[in-house]
Structures are given as C-alpha cells and as structure tokens.
Amino acid sequence: MSFINERVQPEGLTFDDVLLIPAYSEVLPREVNVQTRFSRNISLNIPIVSAAMDTVTEAPLAIALAREGGIGVIHKNMTIAEQAAQVRKVKRAENGMIYDPVTISKDHTVGDALNLMKENKIGGIPVVDADRMLIGIVTNRDLRFQRDMSRRIEEVMTPGDRLVTTHNPELSHAQEILLNSKIEKLPVVDDAGRLVGLITYKDITKVQDHPNACKDAKGRLRVAAGVGVTPDAMDRVKALVAEDVDAVVLDSAHGHSANIVSMLKRIKEVYPSLDVVVGNIATGGAARYLIENGADGVKVGIGPGSICTTRIIAGVGVPQLTAIYDVACVARESGVPVIADGGLRYSGDLVKALAAGGDCVMIGWMFAGREEAPGGTIIFNGRKFKSYRGMGSIDAMKAGSADRYFQKGCEGNISKLVPEGIAARVPFKGSLSETVYQLIGGVRSGMGYCGAKDIETLKQARFIRITASGMQESHPHDVAITSEAPNYSSER
C-alpha cells in the first residue's frame, strides 16, 4: 500500500498556479453581463460580497457596496441589538418608499422631535394618532427657530388639511407631485387616510444616482448578517429577521460539522423563507452535506485569507482554486450558489475564481482600507493605514468570534485561546466605489478575453498551468515602476 496513492490527492491549485486561456470573442468588456446570485433567492448586479469581519463590514460599507450592486455581510462581533441596528441602518438608507417611517404623536414635544431626527438622521416626521391616521407632518424647517423645547408638536406641525398626499406609491408619479408641489416629503395614505409610507425627494435622487443598486422587492438596499453557533444564535436571528435582513450567513471555520448543520436546521425550521448561507468549506462532500440539509448558498475557503493562519497552525486546508472547483461541481447539481471566500489579491483572481465555478467572491482585505470600513485611520511612517484582523486573531476572538473556531468560553483567558489569524494594517485607499469600479472593470476585461457574455459562460473557460517563471513574467518586470496604476501594486 502506497501512502501517496492511497491518501494523497494529486495536487491542489490556487490563483497564481494558473492563467485563463484567451478564446474567440464576440463581446466587448462593456457588453458583458456580470449579474449573478448570492443565495437561492438573492440576485446581485455585481459578483462581490464583503466579508463578515469586524474590520470590514458594518452599515456604512454595506450601504456603499449595495449601491454598487453587491451585498455586505454585517459581522457579529457585537451585541444582538447592535447588529440589528446595523441592519436597520442599511434597510433605511435608501427606499423607493419608506414603509415604516418614524412617526410621532401630536402630544410629543419639539425636543422629542429633534431627538428623533438626530437619532435617525432624518429631516421630517409624519404626525399620526393612535390608529396611524395622518394628522400632519413636522420637518426640520418647522423646528429650526423653536426655542421652547417643551412646545407641543400640534402647535408647530403642518396640519393634515394643508398636506399634499397620495394613494399611489409609484416613484414616477411621486416625483411629479414633489416637483409640482415644491415639497420634499410625500406621505402615502390609504383610502381612509391612514399612513402607509413616506416618499422623499432625497430617496428618489438616490435611486437615480445608483441605478445598479442591489435592492429588495420594496426598493430597499439588501444586506446580510453573520451568525454563529452560540446559545443566543436563535435570538440573534430573530432580531435580524425583525429588521428584514435579506439573508444570514452561518459562519464557522469548519462548516462541514454536525453543530453547524444542527443550527442550520433550527434556523430553516423557524424561518423557512430566510436564505441561509453556510461556510466555510473546501470539498465537494462538504457542499453536498450542507445542501442536503437546507443551505441556500455555500462559502468556500479554509485558510486562503491574507490574515488567516489556519493552514499553518492546524495543517488543514485546500488550495483555493481547487476548493472552488470541487465545491462548484457538486453545488451546480442543485443550483446553489458558491461564494469564493479568500485568497484574492488582484481583479484577475476574481475572474479565475468565477471561471472555476464561483458565483460571487467574498472580499476582506481589499475593503478593509476603505473609508467606509470600521475604524479610523492611523499614521505610520508618514502614510495612512487602517487596521485589519482575522476573525481567528486573539483580539477578534476576545471580541466575540471565538465560537467560529470552536473556542467559545475561552475568551476570558488569553493563554487558553489558540489563534488561527493575525492582526495587521492595510494602506488607506479612499472610497469603496473606486475599488469596486476597478475590480469589476478587471472582471469585465477577463470575460471579454474569454469570449464570455455572462458569468455562467465564463465557467466554461479553460485554464493553463503555469510555472513560477510564468507568474514572474505576468507581473511588470525588468523596470522600475514610476507611476502605479489604481488596480495594481507590487507591495501585495
């Protein structure tokens, strides 16, 4: 019996081991379709997802990414209430119509209204009675010069008989009314005069500014949130569902495990219509196990991340390109999307991940340095940086991610934690939209070279194995770079 023949797979490949072979093309990069899916029931306009990491995704980045056409996954290193509030911020950031606007009663005070406006970052509040009958609206203009904070809202609001309202929530109709009436907020009421929603000119402008945004059926930005296998997991899911989260990501370092599937079944039993993405895995067998037990999406990647040390500390993992392919071969049988998580350094790696079978990619470090990512900037050697840490780092596990690495209960004693990640810094790189533009530009270019009109066609592209010399030849060489491009850095 040979150890090599019996127990060692022939080889595992990652992004730098291959290139895509160019093919005959009838499409230009600007003509290709980059729409895809995140889960069974959630479509994306670009194949990009942000990682559920505490130095990557909170509401600001999730909002920015959804406006570009992707989706963000809010991390869970916070209380249930805090995570639910992050989801709420995303869902309220942009609306065709606000279906559950913040309201106030006529007996509240000017001070109450100002506090509500400040807390929710809004400029107007419908005034309703106990039956939600619209009786007026109060805006920041009504309150701007009020000195008496105890004055009742009824005395300063614009009363219902002077309000312009509508029964038709169509945005084109609402825009016409807003323009003709020279107002900024349009209450939507039913036949009885009961408040149904609120349309603002600001929201209509956002719709026009971000035509590619990833939105739900009500015109709100989509967002997902991470959950783990913890005693309060179902309470967390309940709070997230109450805020209309679009999907939850059941996150673990080893998704091919009994406790993950047990939690998956519990979530699907209570919330059968909620999409649950599960990870991380690295084999086709793991994909089959999760899909058979109800997973609506599977996330691939054990150890490829720049801040992950799992492969070194635990000696476990599969090179990312091979892992994506093996999982995709199984997932395509049931139509479950595959998310390629980790190991990406350049836009060309995104193209390779999609061609190997991924439906979308999850990005961490490339987004951690953006202004929308959590945390402020630091100055080091005269340059701006932002912090970036693996969820398996000691700091992240102390903050709440220990369960992801099956070490729940050890957070209070650092010496008992066995980290599988590090903390680092990444260069500050400006806004997210600039990065996404370059990444999607690279994806479009790669699809054009392969003659792929859409991502499904790209999955038929052929690869060629290359040597280290071939990769060296692929990078700029034999010159000193004097002006770096926005999508390439030799420091990566």
Where on the chain are the PLM-derived regions?
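Alpha/beta catalytic cores of nucleotide-metabolism and tRNA/nucleoside-modifying enzymes
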Residues: 1-24, 104-105, 176, 226, ...
